[in-house]
A protein has these predicted regions:
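Mobile amphipathic helical/loop "lid" adjacent to a hydrophobic cofactor/ligand pocket
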Residues: 89, 108-238, 242
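Conserved flavin/dinucleotide-binding core of flavoenzymes
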Residues: 146, 382-531
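N-terminal glycine-rich dinucleotide-binding loop that anchors FAD/FMN and/or NAD(P) in oxidoreductases
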Residues: 76-114
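Mid-domain catalytic core of redox enzymes
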Residues: 2, 289-427
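Conserved Rossmann-like nucleotide-cofactor binding loop
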Residues: 46, 68, 325
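N-terminal Rossmann-like FAD-binding beta1-loop-alpha1 element of flavoenzymes
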Residues: 36-62
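Glycine-rich FAD pyrophosphate-binding loop
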Residues: 55-85
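Helical element adjacent to the flavin cofactor pocket in flavoenzyme catalytic cores
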Residues: 243-309
Length: 531
């Protein structure tokens, strides 16, 4: 329950430590009596982007209902203390690591606006391995598509005609999807919309793809990327899917983009943003849920609860940088158009568990990947089930640690291994949603009201930045929104060269050096906690 302002001794905010209440409220240094006042509801990447690029021209106030700033940027500082019965049992060893549980990775090809932001903040990052595995315990089937060796981690697959057909269908699907995109571009010129109406499931069913390919490769990959169940993945708009996979190099065996993680965790860029915002006189509320928003002729009235007291403030404009359904609920004078568009966005809840239990990973160490998808029931019984997905943070963040630090979605974890549980909400991508995305201009920059969030595009961090920049442009900020084209490639490459840090752990890290036998004897582990 705190306000962060320039004179507050607590402005150097570190996610997610508690904050001392009743700090000193500072008067902004730059805003004057004529400076427009803007309220931003939500402190995820879109809200923070808005605040950062508006801070020099607007008096910015940010409202966050959570006890930390950053939204899906949620880096946990973890301490694991253990004693060894073979060394000095009275002198426990302690390991401290920073683990991301929400936003983790970005790449050189499709994140130009986010990389530009990191460059302005001077926040370093490091190369990350992006690999994907599937473990289907019901049919004793697993693979990791990163290398030929890991693809055939179950050696019997070398002599399996069914597995070779599975591989062949992956290559066939990649070719046909590229042709599909070319056909769509031609059809679009001729104003034929038939292709844009198809779902991924419709396409797979009509093109004679095998069940092994559908349920153990493509649908799990879509399910994992967008944190949705298999049924929802099949309802995914085909064109939306094809464009995303093509842009991210997922239809190519080679020429895929390089992925990165932030050195020290994603909180590093959030902390850098917060420091600059407070220095500019921005007011940042946490533990402060907004209750209602009402628009008038000359501005916006926002009612909120801070430190247990209901308060009201008036602003010139409001930016909804929260989920669409939250914005819909908060608008006390919502219009029919706003209600229809915002109501088209649906969400699903996913519980993320940070833990050290390797039982959720594939059986073979060779199959362990950055992203590990698990299927533990017959296909018919997992169709409407939320995705069971494990991020191996040692691989993603190049951790040379004593323990395997894992973030798993939607499956029970042995409590002895659990470090922290975090709840996230993700948008459900369907035709209704993609249609609503095209209507943003009908409700944003109207009646002193603006909307941003990654859900207006593909749902990723770059989309959050891009969406925030779009609102900044509406509010008069002169800034370009970079597109993923050759015109920005040289600039992005120069930024990557400046910020990419080849750390020693990154250079020495290999999957074979993972602590595969760690955490087997839980009795020696005294404490797993978030500090």
């Amino acid at each position: 329950m705190a306000v962060f302002t320039k004179k507050s001794p607590h402005f150097n905010y570190k996610v997610p430590k508690p904050v001392v209440a009743n700090p000193i409220v500072a008067k902004p240094t730059k805003p004057t009596i004529t400076t427009p006042k803007v309220a931003i509801i939500g402190s995820g990447v879109s809200g923070l982007t808005c605040a950062y690029y508006l801070k020099d021209s607007h008096a910015v106030t940010m409202f966050e209902s959570n006890d930390y700033l950053g939204g899906h940027v949620n880096t946990l500082d973890v301490t694991v203390t253990e004693r060894s019965p073979f060394k000095n049992p009275f002198k426990p060893s302690t390991e401290k690591v920073a683990i991301d549980t929400g936003f983790i990775v970005f790449n050189e090809r499709t994140y130009p606006n986010f990389i530009r932001l990191l460059d302005e903040l001077n926040v370093p990052f490091q190369k990350a391995e992006m690999s994907f595995s599937v473990k289907n315990t019901y049919i004793n089937f697993e693979y990791n598509g990163h290398t030929l060796n890991s693809l055939f981690s179950q050696r019997r697959h070398v002599l399996s005609p069914r597995f070779w057909q599975f591989v062949q269908q992956i290559l066939r699907f990649n070719r046909e999807t590229k042709s599909l995109l070319a056909n769509f571009r031609q059809a679009d010129k001729m104003q034929q919309a038939a292709l844009s109406q198809q779902t991924l499931g419709d396409y797979l069913d009509s093109h004679d793809y095998g069940e092994l390919f559908k349920t153990n490769y493509l649908v799990p990959m879509v399910s994992a990327i967008w944190s949705m169940g298999m049924d929802d993945a099949k309802r995914f708009p085909l064109l939306f899917f094809a464009q995303f996979f093509d842009n991210h190099g997922l239809l190519d065996v080679v020429n895929r983009p390089q992925w990165f993680t932030l050195v020290g965790g994603s909180k590093q860029y959030v902390n850098a943003l917060i420091t600059r915002l407070v220095a500019a006189g921005t007011t940042l509320y946490i533990n402060t849920p907004v209750q209602s928003v009402r628009r008038g002729k000359d501005g916006v009235s926002i009612e909120f609860i801070h430190q247990g007291k209901r308060q009201t403030q008036v602003f010139d404009d409001v930016v909804f940088a929260c989920h669409a359904d939250v914005a819909r609920r908060l608008l006390a004078d919502i219009t029919e158009t706003e209600s229809a568009i915002l109501g088209a966005f649906e969400y699903t809840d996913n519980e993320a568990v940070l833990h050290t239990d390797t039982q959720v990973l594939p059986k073979k160490l060779l199959t362990w990947a950055s992203w590990n998808y698990a299927i533990d029931k017959p296909t018919a019984r997992v169709a409407d089930q939320k995705p069971i997905l494990t991020y191996h943070m040692n691989i993603l963040e190049r951790l040379t640690a004593k323990h395997n630090y894992l973030v798993t979605l939607n499956t029970p974890i042995n409590e002895a291994h659990v470090i922290k549980r975090v709840d996230y909400r993700h948008p459900v991508y369907d035709k209704k949603m993609t249609d609503a995305q095209k209507r943003w201009h009908e409700i944003s920059a109207k009646r002193h009201t603006h909307f941003c969030g990654a859900y207006w595009f593909n749902g990723f961090h770059e989309d959050g930045v891009k969406s925030g920049l779009r609102v900044c442009q509406s509010l008069g900020v002169d800034i370009d929104i970079l597109l993923t084209t050759n015109t920005t490639a040289a600039t992005t490459a120069a930024q990557i060269k400046r910020l990419s840090k080849p750390s020693k752990p990154s250079a020495k890290f290999t999957v074979s050096k993972l602590p595969s036998h760690a955490d087997k004897k839980l009795s020696v582990v005294q404490r797993r906690q978030v500090t």
